[in-house]
Amino acid sequence: ITNRLVGSEMCIRDSIDNKKIGITGWSLGGTSSLYAAWLPLAEKLAPNGERFASHLSYYPLAMYWPEDMRWSKAPMLNLLGGKDDYTPFSLTQKLTKGISDSGGNCKDILYEEGLHGFDAVQPKTYWPDSIAPNTEKFARIDLKGDISFETDDGEILAGNTVEDRIKLFEKVAKLGTWTGGNWEIRRRAKKDAFDFISKILD
């Protein structure tokens, strides 16, 4: 995210309209694209005020719910798969509502039959060693930036260090997920993405 925001600043010198630079990402990149709109993070990474004009995120992992719910007012669109067992679409939908309720401009499009990677050309594939969240609950980010997660039995787990996250994975993660493209969804998602981006460029 830092590199992209710094790139936006450099574009000023290159006579490029930096007010029309958006960010797009897939999976983990989609997570980065989504949370790049979280203003406390953007303010830290780009203190001179560079911001993205749009945020297009394919099947992001919306695992974090910040206590400070200040978000960019730039348009945000999340493209989600209804059969994604890798990055749960339900978490993204809940966060989208939270962002919108907090004054942001976030929307989702759900492709009911879509797996993770629904726009890929690769066929449906099972990955037995992939790690995915097995929860409908968010990790929380407090005002200091510390991450925590409350389990169903009330245990509070930290999520700040590698060791913390390994312990967290042991509690709330599962092994084994499906990925795979769907040509019909691929075509629809491409059109939805182009329609979204074209509105920013007009």
Label the predicted regions.
Residues 1-7, 11-12:
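Single conserved hydrophobic/aromatic residue that forms the stacking wall/gate
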Residues 13-14, 41-48, 102:
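Alpha-helix termini
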Residues 15-27:
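Alpha/beta-hydrolase fold nucleophile elbow
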Residues 30-45:
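Short glycine-enriched nucleophile-adjacent loop
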Residues 37-41, 100-101, 198-202:
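Sec-exported extracytoplasmic/periplasmic mature domains
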Residues 47-113:
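The feature captures the conserved acid-bearing segment of alpha/beta-hydrolase catalytic domains
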Residues 105-202:
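C-terminal catalytic histidine-bearing segment of alpha/beta-hydrolase fold enzymes
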